[in-house]
Amino acid sequence: MEVKVLNKDGAETGETVELKPVIFEIEPNDHAIYLDVRSIMANQHQGTHKVKTRSEVSGGGRKPYRQKGTGNARRGSSRSPVMIGGGAIFGPKPHDYVVGINKKMKRLARISALSYKAKNNEIIVMEDYVPSEIKTKEVVSFLKSLGLNEKKTLLLMPSKNDVMYKSGRNISKLSILEANKASTYDLLNNKTLLIQKSALETLERSLGVA
């Protein structure tokens, strides 16, 4: 699939690049996408939730009052779960939420996501561009020129660039990532995929396509 390369003003540069069929034209595997997104979302849990049981709360070392004669219910300890300040019954404990997925399936999921984007004409390739200085206005301007100022957009860069990142971090509908670090969730959670020309090569290498 050949696509035209646009400049930051939204005009055609006269160049075209090939979106390789092995990445952008496969039959998407929905189950692989499901497994990868489930793994990504699950692994975001810290799993540090914890409450104290009756053996961990403070106090309650002795019987709070005598067994008979007070008119109250029998109490052996103020740590009892039915008492205010007592321990919790079956409360949450630290838990590892990690859901594993093998590299082959993760790669298939990313390629499936990219193929969906290509199929729906949601990929734009632009020339390599970085603002001359940290300036949000410049990034807003080129997004507007490309017709992306109102669309949730993922911009893929060939490598980490602080000037571009800091210029775009205040734009609510724009995410900026290095091409080799974009996950299946990142690709599908944005309406448009804006790829810089050099980033396309980085993306292909990260997927094992030279």
UniProtKB/Swiss-Prot annotation:
One GO MF term attached to the UniProt entry: rRNA binding
A cellular component term, taken from the record's GO annotations: ribosome
Matches recorded under InterPro entries: Ribosomal_uL4 (IPR002136), Ribosomal_uL4-like (IPR013005), Ribosomal_uL4_dom_sf (IPR023574)
Keywords: Ribonucleoprotein, Ribosomal protein, RNA-binding, rRNA-binding
Signal peptide: none
Keyword rRNA-binding set for record: yes
Family assignment from sequence similarity: Belongs to the universal ribosomal protein uL4 family.
Subunit: Part of the 50S ribosomal subunit.
Annotated function: One of the primary rRNA binding proteins, this protein initially binds near the 5'-end of the 23S rRNA. It is important during the early stages of 50S assembly. It makes multiple contacts with different domains of the 23S rRNA in the assembled 50S subunit and ribosome.
PANTHER family xref list: 50S RIBOSOMAL PROTEIN L4 (PTHR10746), LARGE RIBOSOMAL SUBUNIT PROTEIN UL4M (PTHR10746:SF6)
Name the record gives this protein: Large ribosomal subunit protein uL4
Organism: Chloroherpeton thalassium (strain ATCC 35110 / GB-78)
Taxon lineage: Bacteria, Pseudomonadati, Chlorobiota, Chlorobiia, Chlorobiales
